[in-house]
Amino acid sequence: MYARTGIRRFLDYLIVSAKHQMDVDVCHYSKNPLRIGGQWEHTAGHCKNGIMVCSHEWVEGVIDYYHFTGDERGLETAISIGDNILRLLDTPMYAKPGEANARETGWALRALVALYVETRDEKWLAKCEWIIDSFKIWEEEYGNWLAPYTDNTLIRVGFMISVAAGSVMRYYRVFPREDIKQMLIRAIDDIVENCTLDNGLFYYKELPSLSRNGNNTLLLESLAIAYELTGDKKYLETNINNTGRAGVGSKKVIDDAVIVSGDSTKGFAQSFIPLVTYYKALGDTGLINNVKLY
């Protein structure tokens, strides 16, 4: 937001959030090597149960902080998180494609690609290529990027598939390959064809108890990615009536301010790039005029 507008308060938000991530969210000491340098999962009490997994470690924000401030701790923290991700990926949890949900290795890939783009250090690439290969095996064995939920249940979780698609797309932009492009299109086609309710909106998860409206903006980014890859506007028209709801939720106007009911800073960070990416695609195609705002 600061880069687009020059409004200082957005930079202040970045600095405060990045310093919190660097000082509080990252493990600075532990006898467990799988924790050192990694980012705690956001849980009650900040690190209840001491959980650390690839799906809850992010580096792009602290890299942005490094670029805006010159504070080398930003880059150092990003590298330490990346090193932690590399160690976690060598654990049994990630050994077999399909035994962890798509967002686990999806978020890991996104972090590692960002670190490669920033540093050009090829140490990040080996696991990137391993993750890409695991997604290919996953699709071949299960038909799609299904997520394990019980010992005998595999389901679609659209937003988790979208995490994977967004991360694979970031790799594709650096290392374009036709097989990766086609794998992405198939994954997003699966979301469009199988992850919607009768009302035309995406569902949360493919379980009867969780098959409710899902407005995670990562789903919109996946549609924009499919449009970028194919030029077909049908992807942008899918679920277009959910766009306004996903963007603003409930809101009220007070004087010249629009107040949106609260979400976490993580929620904002996760939503901003998907919304802007989708909005740009709608603007480029003229479909923005079809969006209903709530």
Sequence positions of predicted segments:
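Catalytic cores of extracellular degradative/oxidative enzymes
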Residues: 1-201, 205-228, 232-294
